[in-house]
Amino acid sequence: MDRRIAGAPFLAAILLASLALRASGQEDSTPEMPEIFNEPMPYFTIGLGPFSRTITTDSNEAQAFFNQGIQLMYSFTLMDAARSFREAQLRDSDCAMCYFGEAWAWGPYMNGPMGVGALPRAQAAIEKALELAPDHASRIERELIDAMAVRYMGRTDRTPQLAVDTAYAEAMGRVYEANEADLDVGYLFAESLMLLEPRRGNWDIARAEIQRIHHILEEILAKDIRHPGSCHLYIHSTESTTQPNKAEACADFLGGSIPGASHINHMPSHTYNEVGRWGDGVRANQRAWHSDQAAEYGEGFAIYTSHNLHMLLFAASNDGQGAVAIQAGADYTTATGGAQYYEVLTRVRFGRFEDILAMEGDDTENPIFKAFWDFGQGYAHLRAGHVDVARGFLEAIQEGRGSAPEAAEFRGHSASDLLGIVGGILDGEILREVGRTAEAIESFERALVIEDGLRYDEPEPLNFSVRDWLGAILLEVDRPVQAEAVYRAAIEDHPFNGWSLFGLEQALRAQGKVGEAEETAKILETSWARADVWIRASRF
């Protein structure tokens, strides 16, 4: 990948020196590295933020590459971080912390375990750091190196990871106790504790372990709310709790802290989506998507591109920004080289049924993606008056649900659950269309039970909720009290989403609750300010 370099003279010379330094070799027995490590790692003068950590080195270039490496670590861009730390080693072969950084980069992190072949690389790096530390590291640096050694030394690929993670957290805890004012030490300790928790699922904010993590991160952010790594972790540690709003203040700073890191650009939306700041969620992920594209020109760091687009279309769907959501769905298809399911699902959300019918199908054999396609086609045909055709697509979904392999899943959600939801919505709408409203309500309610049973995910696999269908039909059969309850639950799940606010206003007016309805209308006006769609119900 061609990456451009510009900036101060000593940094402009970095890339030119890389090949010569590499040719001279490093005096260690580094295990075989991924092929990308044969290429020089550039120093990015476009995309990095101001964050730095001074280390023991006489080389400005080594310091610069170390700073780049730690910013990439805070951005979860681990492979490029490891490459940056190795470039720092080439500039100063006595830099103990440059080897520490590489060892850190090969380890497990919030979004994944150690990669294949990573352990011997990490061991080689930390061995070198230990060798250099007595003469080329400060006291704090030696303590960090010793703690990182606990993570890797004396173990094999068969050593239980939990035992390793526990020992590492205990070692890092001792470093933290002696250096609580050091923000990066605090980050490393908090990260080590978070690795002991399940990555997915809801976190109980009352648990002592979670409170400890929050306390450490809050202490760091009280000193410097712009610390990118700690805010990143704080968002992850609060998003699935009952108080995701605790991270709003730092989220407002995080997105621009490492301007070219798409994951950092995107991360505030994990908080914004939970608190209903959908417009901000859209902007965060648009910025991330731009960084992903800029990375092709050496001006950004791309990671999790499909996730950024998924979050973008999800936030835009809840914000009423149909054009943005649909385009993000199309970009998702291109970015993944996969099926067109989000192109279909965004069009269902925004009532673009003629567009769905004009789409050419793909040949996906994935039972979930095929069902999403069938759902969109069936729904569009139903709205076009083709009830029998819609029934045919519903039957395909139901057959697919029965025959899908038990292991079939999307983002950790089973085929049975996801097909049960979209099949339930389509079934309910078909029943409603033919006047069997009581059965339609039952179908929506069954689908809602499945939806409520899905594990925590950010974002959810579907960019809409069954509640918007259930609430709409309850209003149609003159059951506004029940509809109000449905919409209030929908707003609790997805605060300030315009679809459910619209339904709630209707339900309140139907009960004669004029004052509450007017207040809801004001909230809707603000929440729906960026919407490009006019709606008459909470679903098309």
Regions found by a protein language model. Name each.
Residues 90-91, 176-178, 221-223, 253-260, ...:
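Solenoid-like repeat scaffolds
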Residues 78-80, 102-138, 149-163, 196-206, ...:
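Inter-helical turn/loop elements of alpha-helical hairpins
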Residues 66, 100-101, 187, 232-233, ...:
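Alpha-solenoid helical repeat scaffolds
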Residues 72, 106, 150, 193, ...:
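Residue at a conserved register position within TPR or TPR-like alpha-solenoid repeats
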Residues 60-67, 94-106, 136-157, 181-201, ...:
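Amphipathic alpha-helical repeat scaffolds of TPR domains
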Residues 103, 107, 117-134, 282-291, ...:
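TPR/TPR-like (Sel1-like) alpha-helical repeat modules
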